[in-house]
C-alpha cells in the first residue's frame, strides 16, 4: 500500500476512537489498519452512524401496526394510507454543522432529509422543522437564527417543496449548541418502495449525482463529539448544498425507478461513500468492491481517505440491474448528472477499496455495519421534583397584563417572521398554513389530506424525562387530532448531551420509556428516527429534546378544523380536566421568574378518550374551530384563536375551586378548546356528560376584545400587535 501516516495513539484519538475500540479493531482484522481503514472505522463506529450508545434502548420502541409498511432501519419510514398510496417520512438533525456555519448547515440538513425520502421512491410533498436557539440576549443568537432560517428557506424554496410547519424555541441551554431538526414527507405508490439492501453477486454499483469534493470530511465524526471553544475551527467539516442539483437528482432517481432499473439505493449522507456502500452490502449479506479511480471528483489529487469520508451533497449510490445500465446512464446524462460504475457486489462479505491499483482497505463488512460496538452505558434517573401547588404561587400581576406579557415572549410570540421566509404553498396543496396546531397538506388527485406536526417540550423532559417523553408524543397526537386527523405514526429526533455522563444517559432512557409508553397507548408507532448525542459545549448540555414528528390522515381535507373562531355568538367549550398545574409552565417561568417544579402528568387513557371525541366532533361538523392546549395554557390558546380570526370572546370567571392565574395559565394536559353553534351547545354538553368526558362552557365568541368577567379586557388588535412584534423587532436589532 502507499505511504500513509503512521497509526499512533494520538491519531486514533483524533478519529474519535477509544483505546478499547482500537484494540477491538486490531483483534478483528489481525493487523494494524491502514490510514484509510482507520478513517472508515472512525466513520462507521462513531455515535452518529452506529448508534452504539442508543441502539440497546431503541429496541423497546413500538414500531408495528397494520398500516406500517416499513419501520426503522431504512432511509425513512413508510405507512399505508389506502388506495395504493403510501407516505414516506423521517426527521433528522443537523445540529453541529448549523452552529458552526448556520446557512450551509441548515441547507444540507434539509437536503439530506429530502434525499432520505426520495431514495425510497417517494416524491417529497412537505418539510417541517424544529429549531432550538440560545437565549435571545446571547451574542450569537441573532446570527444563528438569521442563517438557519435563510438556509432552510433557501434550500426548500429552490428545490420546490413547501415548508409547512415547525416549532421554534429559545433557551440559554442552547447557547453553545443549537438544534436544527428537519423533517420531510413524501408520497409514493405503496407497491413501489425502494430499499437499501443489495442483492445478487457481480451487480454494478453506480455513483450518481454531483461530484465528490473535500467538503464535509469527518462531518459524522464531528456530530459525535461535544464542542469546546475551538469549535469554530471545524468550519471545513460543514458540507455545502446545491438545491438545484438535488432537484435534478430527484427527477433522475424517480425516472430510473419508474424504468425498473434499481435493485437497491442508498443516499450518500453521513460518512458519505463509506456508509452508503457498507450499509448496502451489510444489509444484503454481500461484499462490496469499490474502485475509487472511477469516482467523479471536483478537486484534483484526492486521496482514498478523502473520497471515502467526503460528505459532498446531492449524491446517491445504487445497485442496478445489469441489463438496465445503459438505460439508467442515459437518464442521468439527460439530467446533466454524473453516472459512474464504481464497483460490484461480491459474495465475500468484505469491503474492499482500491485506488490507483492499490488495495487501500480490506475489511469485514458486517462488523463495520450491523455489528459495530454496542454499549449499555451507566444511567441514573433524574431526581423527582416537588409538585408546585397553585395557591403557593403569588401572582405578580393581573390576568390580562400577564397574557399581554406572555404572548410577546420569545417562545410564545408569533413565528411569522420565520415561516414567511419559507414558501409554504408551492405545489399548491397546502390546506392549512403555519400558525395552527398542525399543517394540512392535500394528497393530490383525491379528497385525502395529511396532518403534519413537530412537537416537544424540553423543560418538561428536563424536569421529568418519563413524563416529558410521554407529553411530546401526546402533544403531537393532540395537534393532529385538533385539525381532524387520525394519528398514524411518528418519526423521532432524539437530541441529548454526552451519553458518557450517567445523568444524561438517564434522561435519554427516561424520555425513551415515556415515548414508548405513549406510542403504545395511543397506537402511534415509531417508523423512523435519528439520535443526536454529544450536544454539549464545555460540559454544559442542552435541555433533553426528543422532537416528535407526527403524521395523520384526513379522509376529506375539506373537513379539517382550524384554530380561528369562525363567527360571533358561538359557544366556547373547554374539553378535558383543568386543575391549574403551574409546575414548569411558561407562566411560572416568564411571569413569575421560576423555572421549577414537576411538569404536568400525562394521563394517556384520557388523551385517547378525549381526543377521539374531539375528532368525532370535527368529522361530524359540530366543532367549528378547535385548538389543543399546551404552552401558556387556556388563556393563551383563547388569544391565539381570537387573533387568528379577529373575533373576540366574552369569558366566564375562573371557577372558585381554582386559583385564577393557575386556571388561565396552567398547563394541564389532554385538553382542547372547541367552538360550536349556540344551538348545539346544550346537546354537546349532555353528550359529553354521557361519555364521561369533562366538558365546560367557558364563554361565547363575539366583539373585538377578550373580556373576562370580573377582570379587565383587551382588544384583539392590541394582542395581535404584541404577538407579531417581538421576533421582527428582535431580528431588527431591538434589545432582547
From Swiss-Prot:
InterPro entries: PRibForGlyAmidine_synth_PurL, PurL_linker, PurM-like_C_dom, PurM-like_C_sf, PurM-like_N, PurM-like_N_sf
Name of the gene this protein is made from: purL
Record-given protein name: Phosphoribosylformylglycinamidine synthase subunit PurL
GO molecular function annotation: ATP binding; magnesium ion binding; phosphoribosylformylglycinamidine synthase activity
Cysteine-cysteine disulfides: none
Pathway membership: Purine metabolism; IMP biosynthesis via de novo pathway; 5-amino-1-(5-phospho-D-ribosyl)imidazole from N(2)-formyl-N(1)-(5-phospho-D-ribosyl)glycinamide: step 1/2
Gene3D superfamilies associated with the record: PurM-like C-terminal domain, PurM-like, N-terminal domain
Gene Ontology cellular-component annotations: cytoplasm
Amino acid at each position: 500500500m502507499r505511504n500513509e501516516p503512521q497509526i499512533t495513539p494520538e491519531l486514533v484519538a483524533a478519529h474519535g476512537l477509544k483505546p478499547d475500540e482500537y484494540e477491538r479493531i486490531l483483534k478483528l482484522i489481525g493487523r494494524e489498519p491502514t490510514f484509510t481503514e482507520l478513517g472508515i472505522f472512525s466513520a462507521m463506529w462513531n455515535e452518529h452512524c452506529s448508534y452504539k450508545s442508543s441502539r440497546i434502548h431503541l429496541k423497546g420502541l413500538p414500531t408495528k401496526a397494520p398500516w406500517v409498511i416499513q419501520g426503522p432501519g431504512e432511509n425513512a419510514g413508510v405507512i399505508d394510507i389506502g388506495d395504493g398510496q403510501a407516505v414516506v417520512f423521517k426527521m433528522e438533525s443537523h445540529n453541529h454543522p448549523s452552529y458552526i456555519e448556520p446557512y450551509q448547515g441548515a441547507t444540507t440538513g434539509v437536503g439530506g432529509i429530502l434525499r432520505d425520502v426520495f431514495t425510497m421512491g417517494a416524491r417529497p410533498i412537505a418539510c417541517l422543522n424544529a429549531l432550538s436557539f440560545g437565549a435571545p440576549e446571547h451574542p450569537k443568537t441573532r446570527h444563528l437564527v438569521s442563517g438557519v432560517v435563510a438556509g432552510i428557506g433557501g434550500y426548500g424554496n429552490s428545490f420546490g417543496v413547501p415548508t409547512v410547519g415547525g416549532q421554534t424555541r429559545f433557551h440559554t441551554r442552547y447557547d453553545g449548541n443549537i438544534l436544527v431538526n428537519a423533517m420531510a414527507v413524501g408520497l409514493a405508490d405503496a407497491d413501489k418502495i425502494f430499499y437499501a439492501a443489495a442483492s445478487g453477486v457481480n451487480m454494478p454499483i453506480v455513483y450518481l449525482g454531483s461530484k465528490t469534493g473535500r467538503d464535509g470530511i469527518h462531518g459524522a465524526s464531528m456530530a459525535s463529539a461535544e464542542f469546546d471553544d475551538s469549535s469554530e475551527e471545524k468550519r471545513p467539516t460543514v458540507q455545502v448544498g446545491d438545491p438545484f442539483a438535488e432537484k435534478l437528482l430527484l427527477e433522475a432517481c424517480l425516472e430510473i425507478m419508474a424504468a425498473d432499473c434499481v435493485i437497491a439505493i442508498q443516499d450518500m449522507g453521513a460518512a458519505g461513500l463509506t456508509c452508503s456502500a457498507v450499509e448496502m452490502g451489510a444489509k444484503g449479506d454481500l461484499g462490496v468492491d469499490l474502485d475509487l479511480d472511477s469516482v467523479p471528483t471536483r478537486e484534483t489529487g484526492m486521496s482514498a481517505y478523502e473520497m471515502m469520508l467526503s460528505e459532498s451533497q446531492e449524491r446517491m449510490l445504487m445497485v442496478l440491474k445489469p441489463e438496465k445500465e445503459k438505460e439508467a446512464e442515459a437518464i442521468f446524462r439527460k439530467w446533466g448528472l454524473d453516472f459512474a460504475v464504481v464497483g460490484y457486489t461480491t459474495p465475500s462479505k468484505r469491503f474492499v477499496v482500491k485506488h490507483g491499483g492499490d488495495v487501500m482497505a480490506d475489511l469485514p463488512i458486517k462488523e463495520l455495519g450491523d455489528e459495530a460496538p454496542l454499549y449499555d452505558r451507566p444511567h441514573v434517573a433524574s431526581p423527582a421534583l416537588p409538585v408546585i401547588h397553585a395557591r403557593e404561587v403569588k401572582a405578580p400581576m393581573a390576568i390580562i397584563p400577564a397574557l399581554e406579557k406572555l404572548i410577546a415572549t420569545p417562545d410564545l410570540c408569533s413565528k411569522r417572521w420565520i415561516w414567511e421566509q419559507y414558501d409554504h404553498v408551492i405545489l399548491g396543496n397546502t390546506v392549512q398554513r403555519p400558525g395552527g396546531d398542525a399543517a394540512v397538506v392535500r394528497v393530490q388527485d383525491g379528497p385525502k389530506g395529511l396532518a403534519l406536526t413537530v412537537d416537544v417540550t424540553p423543560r418538561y423532559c428536563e424536569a421529568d424525562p418519563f413524563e416529558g417523553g410521554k407529553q411530546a408524543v401526546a402533544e403531537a397526537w393532540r395537534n393532529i387530532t385538533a385539525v381532524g386527523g387520525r394519528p398514524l405514526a411518528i418519526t423521532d429526533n432524539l437530541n441529548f448531551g454526552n451519553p458518557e455522563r450517567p445523568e444524561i444517559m438517564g434522561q435519554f432512557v427516561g424520555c425513551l420509556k415515556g415515548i414508548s409508553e405513549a406510542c403504545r397507548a395511543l397506537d402511534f408507532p415509531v417508523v423512523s428516527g435519528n439520535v443526536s448525542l454529544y450536544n454539549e459545549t464545555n460540559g454544559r448540555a442542552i435541555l433533553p429534546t426528543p422532537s416528535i414528528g407526527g403524521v395523520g390522515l384526513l379522509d376529506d381535507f375539506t373537513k379539517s378544523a382550524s384554530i380561528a373562531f369562525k363567527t360571533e355568538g358561538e359557544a366556547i367549550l373547554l374539553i378535558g380536566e383543568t386543575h391549574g398545574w403551574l409546575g414548569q409552565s411558561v407562566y411560572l417561568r416568564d411571569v413569575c421568574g421560576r423555572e421549577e417544579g414537576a411538569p404536568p402528568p400525562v394521563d394517556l387513557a384520557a388523551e385517547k378518550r378525549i381526543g377521539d371525541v374531539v375528532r368525532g366532533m370535527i368529522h361530524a361538523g359540530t366543532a367549528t374551530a378547535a385548538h389543543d392546549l399546551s404552552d401558556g395554557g387556556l388563556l393563551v390558546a383563547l388569544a391565539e384563536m381570537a387573533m387568528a380570526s379577529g373575533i373576540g370572546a366574552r369569558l366566564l370567571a375562573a371557577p372558585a375551586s381554582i386559583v385564577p392565574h393557575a386556571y388561565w395559565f396552567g398547563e394541564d394536559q389532554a385538553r382542547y378548546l372547541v367552538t360550536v353553534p349556540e344551538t348545539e351547545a346544550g346537546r354537546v354538553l349532555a353528550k359529553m356528560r354521557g361519555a364521561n368526558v369533562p366538558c365546560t362552557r367557558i364563554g361565547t365568541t363575539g366583539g373585538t376584545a377578550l373580556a373576562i368577567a370580573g377582570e379587565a379586557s383587551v382588544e384583539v388588535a392590541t394582542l395581535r400587535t404584541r404577538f407579531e412584534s417581538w421576533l421582527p423587532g428582535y431580528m431588527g436589532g431591538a434589545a432582547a
